[in-house]
């Protein structure tokens, strides 16, 4: 998210090749990834990915403008995906209040996009922003569905 602010938007077509949006959900085009294969080289990206985006940055290599441009494009794709998922949920539930936790909840650009584009009216980011916040949300959902009392302290 931080690097994205310094990037330029010209890699959208490449992002559209590797991250597909279908029926308001997303999936990775696995032709571009190799992390799911049981292989010994432990490479995350396939040769096809490297041909499309170039060699991964080495640990001792400085960031180039291209890295900032990649961050910008990934950020925009992330916003597009989450916005579509949230829009679908709002349409189904008619609830325009959203709670986000985990790394997604800390993405200020995403949150601003959801409010600015009127996808939701309000976003709550719990103080426990790590992924364990999802466990708390699941517990609250269960209690609500079972009409059990939620005790607030």
Where in this protein do the model-derived segments appear?
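Short acidic/glycine-rich loops and adjacent helix/strand connectors
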Residues: 1-153
